[in-house]
């Protein structure tokens, strides 16, 4: 069962008087949440060399997302979506990446691959050291810890290729073709942290 369907399953069963038994795994339950130490988070923000601090709504968005291992964040144009993504990614790398896994960021266009890379550099990241970009026939094998790719470039990759990722961030997730995105997510079985970003939600 896809995690996103869990809430609908609970509603379906509740309306029909069915009980639901769950067995928690290392990934937790889709609707479970954990407490984020805001003192630790504030110290983290001070130490990562940001050119500016997050606005209140950006701060709240990151904290809310971190309380869950998967979520869709509604982030309209001008809200600083790439900055929210950056903070989530860097917090994961600093505190949650216990298995030394990589981060995969999926975008719909090559221009967004370059834009995110440029944004992350502006936020203080050493992009030459840490980021590998995949599109238009670029090499899909790298030792770098963060991969930014178009979904078109990777959705046909074998399952083994996705096992190195512990976090997946999807930009403009409402525009992904459902079968392609499902293929990626189903193959990335080791990715405990999954977040989608969109400026609009359909339905």
Task: Please name every model-derived segment.
Residues 79:
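ATP-binding Walker
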Residues 28-74:
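Conserved pre-motif I regulatory segment
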Residues 1-33:
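Interdomain "pre-motor" coupling segment immediately N-terminal to P-loop NTPase/helicase cores
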Residues 2, 54, 105, 147:
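Conserved SAM-binding loop
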Residues 151-203:
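SF2 helicase catalytic motif II
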Residues 121-159:
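Inter-Walker segment of RecA-like/P-loop motor cores
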Residues 74-75, 106:
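Residues at the beta-strand->loop junction immediately N-terminal to the Walker
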Residues 82-87, 91-92, 99-122, 203:
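Conserved Walker A/P-loop ATP-binding site and its immediately adjacent core
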């Amino acid at each position: 069962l896809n995690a996103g369907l869990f809430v609908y399953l609970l509603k379906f069963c509740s309306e029909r008087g069915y009980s639901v038994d769950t067995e928690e795994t290392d990934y937790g339950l889709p609707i479970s949440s954990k407490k984020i130490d805001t003192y630790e988070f504030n110290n983290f923000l001070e130490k990562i060399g940001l050119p500016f601090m997050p606005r209140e709504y950006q701060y709240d968005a990151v904290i809310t997302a971190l309380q869950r291992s998967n979520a869709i964040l509604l982030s309209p144009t001008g809200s600083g979506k790439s900055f929210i993504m950056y903070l989530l990614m860097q917090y994961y790398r600093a505190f949650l990446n216990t298995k030394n896994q990589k981060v995969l960021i999926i975008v719909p266009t090559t221009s967004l691959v370059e834009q995110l890379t440029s944004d992350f550099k502006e936020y203080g990241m050493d992009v030459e050291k840490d980021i590998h970009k995949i599109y238009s026939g670029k090499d899909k094998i790298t030792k770098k810890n963060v991969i930014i790719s178009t979904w078109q470039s990777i959705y046909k990759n074998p399952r083994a290729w996705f096992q190195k990722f512990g976090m997946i961030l999807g930009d403009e997730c409402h525009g992904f073709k459902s079968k392609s995105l499902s293929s990626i997510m189903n193959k990335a079985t080791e990715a405990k942290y999954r977040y989608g970003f969109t400026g609009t939600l359909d339905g």
